[in-house]
C-alpha cells in the first residue's frame, strides 16, 4: 500500500491502546500539528485510524472582571450606597447615591442598567429606590467572579453567559483530537506501507519543467482546523443606517444634515412646543453650560414663532396664552430629536427656500436623558423624514410607511392615534417583534399643524415622522435588548457574527 510520507509517519507513531493527541504526534514526527491533523483525517477516511474529538471550555476573568471581583459589582455597590442613603424607605436623588458608591465613567451606566434587572430597586425620574428584601450577598454573578478568582470552575452556564456579555469573562473553547490505530491500520503496517512524496502546491517551476505531470499532488483537507479571525466590520447599526439611506433615496428623498447642538428655538419653539412643556425641563435634556445660549436668532422668524405661541395661527387661531421668553429659546442643548433639522430646512435656513413638492430625510443621532432599559438609551438614531405637497392626508402617510418598511420585509404595521404639540392628526407606529410576537413602538408621525408651518412661511401640507433605527433593527434581526448592539453592555459576539443582509 502506498501512502504519503506524513500519513505513514502518523501510522508508525499511533497506538492501538493509547490515544495520541495531535500535538504529541507532531512532536514525535517533526511535522507541524496542522499537517498531522490533515494526515490523520485522511487516514480516518481510509479506516486506518480513529480520530476522536473532545471540546474543553475555559472561562477566564478579564481585567474588568478581576477589578469587580475585588471591588464589587457596580450594581451591588450602588445598592449598598442606596441603603445607606435610606432609599429602602423613600426614593433618594440618584446623583448623590452614585457619588457615595464611588462610581464614575462607564461604571455608572453599568450600575444603573443592572440595578433594576437584578431587582435591587427602581429608578424613576432621577430618583432611586432600594428593595430592602434584595440579597446582594448571594448575587450569582458576584459569586461566580469570586469562584473564578479562586481558580475553580463555574457550572451555571447562564451566569457565565451573562458575565461574558458584560465582558467580565472570556469563554474559549478548544477542540482536542486524539488518534488511535485501528485493526485495519495494524494489518496494513504488517503488510508493509510504502511512503510516497506528495506535492502540496503547483509552482511555476513545475509548470515550466513539465514535472507536474509526473508528481502526485496532495488532497486539500477542507475539514482541517483553521485560525479564527475576527476582522473589523461595519457595525450592524451603521449597516442598517446605510440601507435606510439607500431605500429613502430610492423613494425620491433628499438627505439633510444639521447641528447636533442647537438652540431650543429650533429644537422646540419652532415646533410649537410650549416653553412649559415637561420635556423641556433639565431632567429630560442635555443642556450646555459653556456656551449656554446662542448669540443670534432670525428676528423675523422669532417674531412669527412668538406670535404663534401667544395667538395661534390664522383668523381663528388660539395659542397657549402663556409667556414666551426669547432668552429661554436661545438656550443651547443636544437635540432631543432630529426634527430640529426639519424646522431649519422648512424655514429655508439650511438650504434654499423649499417649495412643493419636496421630500427630505436624515438618519442622525438624537440625545435624551432617558432611563436606560431594554428599549431606551441616552443617545439613539432617529430616521427623520417629511414630505411637502398639496392636499396630503393620513392615508398618504400610512402608505409611505408601508412602502418603506416593506423594503425590510416588515409588513405587520399597526397605527395608534396620539397627541403631539406640532402635528394634528398624529399617530404612533407599532411593529411586531419576530421573536416575542409583541408589538413594539417604532415611531411617531403626523401632519404638521398650521401653528408650526405658518411662522416658517411654508405653503402646503407637510407630513412628517421620526422613526427609531434601533427598533427597526430589532424587527430585522430579532434581538430584544437595545443595549446588545451599542453601549457599554453590547454583545460583542452578536456584533462579530451578525449576518450582513442587504
From Swiss-Prot:
Listed PROSITE patterns: AA_TRNA_LIGASE_II (PS50862)
GO biological process: phenylalanyl-tRNA aminoacylation
Molecular function (Gene Ontology), one example: phenylalanine-tRNA ligase activity
Location relative to the cell: Cytoplasm
SUPFAM superfamilies: Class II aaRS and biotin synthetases
Keywords on record: Aminoacyl-tRNA synthetase, ATP-binding, Cytoplasm, Ligase, Magnesium, Metal-binding, Nucleotide-binding, Protein biosynthesis
Binding site for Mg(2+): 424
EC nos: 6.1.1.20
Residues that, per the record, bind L-phenylalanine: 339, 382-384, 422, 448
Stored Gene3D superfamilies: Bira Bifunctional Protein, Domain 2, Winged helix-like DNA-binding domain superfamily/Winged helix DNA-binding domain
InterPro entries associated with the record: aa-tRNA-synth_II, aa-tRNA-synth_II/BPL/LPL, Phe-tRNA-synth_IIc_asu, Phe_tRNA_ligase_alpha_bac/arc, Phenylalanyl-tRNA_Synthase, WH-like_DNA-bd_sf
Cofactor dependency: Mg(2+)
Keyword Transferase included in the entry's annotation: no
Cellular component per GO, a single term: cytoplasm
Free-text remark on how the cofactor is bound: Binds 2 magnesium ions per tetramer.
Reaction(s) this enzyme catalyzes, per UniProt: tRNA(Phe) + L-phenylalanine + ATP = L-phenylalanyl-tRNA(Phe) + AMP + diphosphate + H(+)
HAMAP family: Phe_tRNA_synth_alpha2 (MF_00282)
Subunit annotation: Tetramer of two alpha and two beta subunits.
Record-stated family: Belongs to the class-II aminoacyl-tRNA synthetase family. Phe-tRNA synthetase alpha subunit type 2 subfamily.
This protein's name: Phenylalanine--tRNA ligase alpha subunit
Species this protein is from: Halobacterium salinarum (strain ATCC 700922 / JCM 11081 / NRC-1) (Halobacterium halobium)
Gene name of the record: pheS
Amino acid at each position: 500500500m502506498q501512502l504519503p510520507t506524513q500519513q505513514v509517519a502518523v501510522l508508525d507513531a499511533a497506538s492501538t491502546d493509547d490515544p495520541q493527541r495531535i500535538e504529541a504526534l507532531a512532536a514525535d514526527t517533526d511535522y507541524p500539528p496542522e499537517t498531522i491533523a490533515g494526515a490523520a483525517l485522511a487516514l480516518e477516511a481510509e479506516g486506518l485510524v480513529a480520530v476522536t474529538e473532545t471540546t474543553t471550555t475555559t472561562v477566564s476573568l478579564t481585567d474588568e472582571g478581576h477589578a469587580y471581583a475585588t471591588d464589587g459589582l457596580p450594581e451591588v455597590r450602588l445598592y449598598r450606597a442606596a441603603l445607606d442613603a435610606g432609599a429602602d424607605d423613600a426614593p433618594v436623588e440618584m446623583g448623590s447615591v452614585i457619588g457615595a458608591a464611588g462610581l464614575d465613567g462607564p461604571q455608572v451606566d453599568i450600575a444603573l442598567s443592572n440595578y433594576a434587572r437584578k431587582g435591587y430597586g427602581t429608578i424613576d425620574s432621577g430618583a432611586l429606590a432600594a428593595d430592602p428584601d434584595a440579597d446582594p450577598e448571594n448575587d450569582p454573578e458576584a459569586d461566580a467572579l469570586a469562584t473564578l478568582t479562586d481558580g475553580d470552575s463555574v457550572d451555571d452556564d447562564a451566569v457565565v453567559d451573562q458575565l461574558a456579555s458584560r465582558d467580565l469573562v472570556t469563554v474559549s473553547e478548544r477542540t482536542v483530537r486524539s488518534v488511535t490505530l485501528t485493526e485495519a491500520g495494524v494489518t496494513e503496517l504488517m503488510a508493509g506501507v510504502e511512503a510516497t512524496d506528495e506535492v502540496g502546491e503547483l509552482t511555476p517551476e513545475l509548470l515550466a519543467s513539465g514535472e507536474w505531470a509526473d508528481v502526485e499532488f496532495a488532497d486539500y483537507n477542507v475539514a482541517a482546523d483553521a485560525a479564527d479571525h475576527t476582522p473589523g466590520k461595519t457595525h450592524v447599526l451603521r449597516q442598517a443606517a446605510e440601507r435606510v439611506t439607500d431605500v429613502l433615496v430610492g423613494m425620491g428623498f433628499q438627505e439633510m444634515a444639521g447641528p447636533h447642538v442647537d438652540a431650543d428655538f429650533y429644537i422646540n419653539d419652532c415646533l410649537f412646543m410650549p416653553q412649559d412643556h415637561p420635556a423641556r425641563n433639565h431632567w429630560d435634556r442635555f443642556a450646555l453650560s459653556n456656551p449656554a445660549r446662542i448669540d443670534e436668532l432670525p428676528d423675523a422668524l422669532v417674531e412669527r414663532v412668538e406670535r404663534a405661541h401667544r395667538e395661534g395661527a390664522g383668523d381663528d387661531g388660539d395659542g397657549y396664552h402663556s409667556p414666551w421668553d426669547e432668552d429661554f429659546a436661545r438656550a443651547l442643548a443636544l437635540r432631543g430629536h432630529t426634527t430640529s433639522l426639519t424646522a431649519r430646512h422648512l424655514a429655508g435656513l439650511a438650504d434654499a427656500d423649499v417649495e412643493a413638492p419636496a421630500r427630505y430625510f436624515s438618519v442622525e443621532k438624537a440625545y435624551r436623558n432617558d432611563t436606560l432599559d431594554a428599549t431606551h438609551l441616552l443617545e439613539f438614531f432617529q430616521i427623520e423624514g417629511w414630505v411637502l405637497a398639496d392636499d396630503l392626508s393620513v392615508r398618504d402617510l400610512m402608505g409611505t410607511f408601508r412602502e418603506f418598511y416593506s423594503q425590510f420585509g416588515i409588513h405587520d404595521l399597526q397605527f395608534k392615534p396620539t397627541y403631539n404639540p406640532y402635528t394634528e392628526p398624529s399617530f404612533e407606529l407599532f411593529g411586531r417583534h419576530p421573536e416575542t410576537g409583541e408589538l413594539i413602538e417604532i415611531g411617531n408621525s403626523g401632519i404638521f399643524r398650521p401653528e408650526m408651518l405658518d411662522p416658517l412661511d411654508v405653503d402646503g401640507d407637510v407630513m412628517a415622522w421620526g422613526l427609531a433605527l434601533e427598533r427597526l433593527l430589532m424587527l430585522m434581526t430579532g434581538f430584544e435588548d437595545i443595549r446588545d448592539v451599542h453601549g457599554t453592555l453590547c454583545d460583542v459576539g452578536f456584533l462579530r457574527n451578525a449576518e450582513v443582509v442587504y
